[in-house]
Regions:
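Catalytic beta/alpha-barrel core
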Residues: 6, 23-31, 55, 66, ...
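Active-site cofactor/substrate anionic-group-binding motifs, chiefly glycine-
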Residues: 20-76
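Alpha-helix-loop-beta-strand connector modules within alpha/beta enzyme cores
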Residues: 30-54, 89-113, 120, 135, ...
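Conserved, mostly hydrophobic/aromatic
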Residues: 36, 69, 114, 141, ...
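Catalytic cores of alpha/beta
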Residues: 57-68, 121-132, 155, 161, ...
Length: 214
């Protein structure tokens, strides 16, 4: 990173790629949200994560993180559920935490994506977490942080899509590194894919389009 309050060079590059390719948003570390928002000047939505990567921060801490992020210019907040509480079956805790963050973010016109970290949950827990997220007001349910034991799977995307109404969108993330995986994820019900290989995937898409195969 550069000294002082400058954004990390890598994060500036991510913003440049996001604007170049018309990405839905770019995900930036919370400490650089303000600089990123100023840098893109409204040309690109800024996202950040809270409770990353295991969701074990207290609800109050997560709410502060969300409030701080939105105040600094974040348009989207990706929150990790408290995985331990979900596994324990403490559904009231999980839903209440999601609702508090959704209420806070929505009051400031930001959207919330709820990260399940599906690799640690049973199918029944994944389904239930999707239902709790929708009941709490989430805009998206999202598979993974990318830091778990496994990322996005097609089966998980299908399950999640079937577990929420059309009012909630599904995002796949973790291990999506090529165009074929993006297309498979979309076919399985994902409205968005979280990727770090944007330039590579777009190059594949452009080449395939020129060949008349897309």
């Amino acid at each position: 990173c550069l000294v002082g309050s400058e954004m990390c060079i890598r994060d500036r590059g991510i913003c440049d790629d996001g604007m170049k390719y018309g990405c839905a948003s770019v995900c930036i570390p919370a400490s650089y949200v303000k600089q990123a928002a100023e840098y893109v000047a409204g040309k690109l939505p800024i996202c950040t994560v809270i409770g990353f990567p295991n969701g074990y921060d207290t609800t109050a801490a997560k709410c502060f993180m969300a409030s701080d992020a939105v105040a600094n210019g974040a348009d989207e907040v990706d929150m990790v559920i408290n995985i331990g509480e979900m596994i324990r079956g403490n559904e009231a805790y999980v839903q209440d935490e999601i609702k508090q963050i959704c209420d806070l973010a929505h009051s400031r016109n930001a959207i919330v994506k709820v990260i399940l970290e599906t690799c640690y949950l049973t199918d029944a827990q994944k389904k239930r977490c999707c239902e709790l997220s929708e009941a709490a007001g989430a805009d998206f349910v999202k598979t993974s942080t990318g830091y778990g034991t496994k990322g996005c799977t097609i089966d998980d995307l299908k399950l999640m899509r079937a577990s929420v109404s059309d009012h909630v969108r599904v995002k796949g993330s973790g291990g999506i590194r090529d165009l074929d995986t993006v297309l498979a994820a979309r076919a399985a019900g994902a409205s968005r894919c979280g990727v770090s290989a944007t330039e590579k995937i777009m190059a594949e898409a452009e080449a395939r389009y020129r060949e008349g195969k897309l």
